[in-house]
Regions:
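Interhelical loop/hinge segments that connect adjacent transmembrane helices in multipass membrane
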Residues: 1-9, 186-190, 204-247, 290-305
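Hydrophobic alpha-helical transmembrane segments
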Residues: 19, 132, 161-177, 181-210, ...
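Alpha-helical transmembrane segments of polytopic membrane transporters and translocases
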Residues: 44-60, 89-93, 192, 199, ...
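Helix-loop junctions and terminal segments of transmembrane helices
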Residues: 61-77, 153, 212-213, 269, ...
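Membrane-interface junctions at transmembrane-helix termini in multi-pass inner-membrane proteins
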Residues: 139-166, 176, 187
Length: 334
């Protein structure tokens, strides 16, 4: 059993790393081409407008962690009725949250976009189109999040990897379409980008409905169930708020004080930073379901051994990744 789990984690990690390497290579390339095609100012506008909606996404980030944990826990207990209830309940919460965020985005968010951000007057209309495309993408993305959690809980990392590779391949196609587009390139890019996001999310939902019988929607009210889920989400709310202010909050301040050109520079640096962090997050995605399932099954000895082993591997992965960077900084100072 232990060896099987180790082999599964190793295989899943390999699949996620292949996904990440492909994703990183294509993303860095497309960022450069999109920057050249849109221009510095429009590129900055695209990122800062999308950032307004990302600031509202901290609620989704905290709820997503709880969704993944509760679905994996139910799967680890081999309790099918609990699994179906958990999926249906988390789907209801995510759909309600998606509607709530759309309402806030179309009121407070829209006011903030048009009155507080520094956007050239001749690009205000384009910025509003970007914003609406981002709202569509965000609504679909939030509503489908339980499907992603189901795939990870079942440790179908190959599907997760294939979807990621397909997504970046479509984004690569977007770059070509953007270059030849006769329309406003900023508006075209925002809707093409949103279309890819919507398509991938629908493919996640289609796969889950076809392969996992627990993926069935049902409206129900269970006060204790929702209370437990939301209470667990509250513990992650503080960290997601901090990351949100550190990321998109700084982006908003840079725009207000320095304009969209500085946003363009930071967005490129932010993408490189995210690519580096994805090395460890991919490994965590591979072993987190195992940890939760072992805890749910009451196999504590194997649980502790796995935690120690995975912690060592995480440290080594991060060490070998950052060592060349520290060496480069040290030699450049010398």
């Amino acid at each position: 059993m232990v060896n099987e789990n180790k082999k599964r984690v190793a295989k899943n990690t390999m699949m996620l790393y292949l996904r990440m390497l492909f994703y990183m290579a294509v993303s860095l390339y497309t960022s450069r081409v999109v920057l050249q095609t849109l221009g510095i100012e429009d590129f900055g506008i695209f990122n800062v407008v999308g950032g307004v909606l990302s600031m509202l996404g901290f609620l989704n980030a905290s709820l997503t962690g709880s969704t993944s944990r509760f679905i994996t826990f139910a799967l680890g207990k081999n309790d099918y009725s609990l699994l179906r209830k958990t999926f249906a309940g988390t789907s209801n919460l995510h759909f309600g949250l998606a509607i709530f965020i759309v309402v806030i985005a179309e009121t407070i968010g829209l006011w903030f976009l048009n009155t507080q951000l520094i956007i050239p007057e001749n690009r205000i209309v384009a910025a509003n189109w970007i914003y609406q495309a981002s709202i569509i993408s965000a609504f679909i993305g939030i509503a489908q999040m339980p499907y992603s959690s189901i795939i990870v809980a079942h440790e179908k990392m190959n599907i997760y990897a294939y979807m990621g590779i397909l997504e970046v391949s479509l984004k690569l196609l977007i770059v070509y379409l953007l270059i030849i587009s006769p329309f406003d390139k900023l508006i075209s890019y925002s809707f093409l980008y949103a279309s890819v996001s919507v398509l991938i999310n629908f493919m996640y939902a289609f796969y889950c409905h076809k392969n996992f019988s627990e993926c069935r929607h049902k409206l129900f009210w269970d006060r204790e169930f929702y209370k437990e889920l939301l209470t667990f989400s509250g513990w992650t709310l503080y960290s997601t708020l901090s990351w949100m202010f550190k990321g998109q909050g700084v982006n908003m301040l840079l725009n207000i004080f320095f304009g969209p050109v500085v946003n363009a520079a930071r967005s490129i640096a932010f993408q490189v930073n995210s690519a580096v962090k994805s090395f460890i997050s991919n490994f965590s995605t591979a072993f987190n379901p195992q940890i939760t399932k072992l805890y749910a099954a009451g196999e504590y000895t194997e649980l502790y051994q796995s935690i120690i082993q995975y912690s060592k591997i995480s440290f080594l992965l991060l060490f070998f990744l950052t060592l060349p960077i520290f060496c480069l900084l040290y030699t450049s100072d010398a």
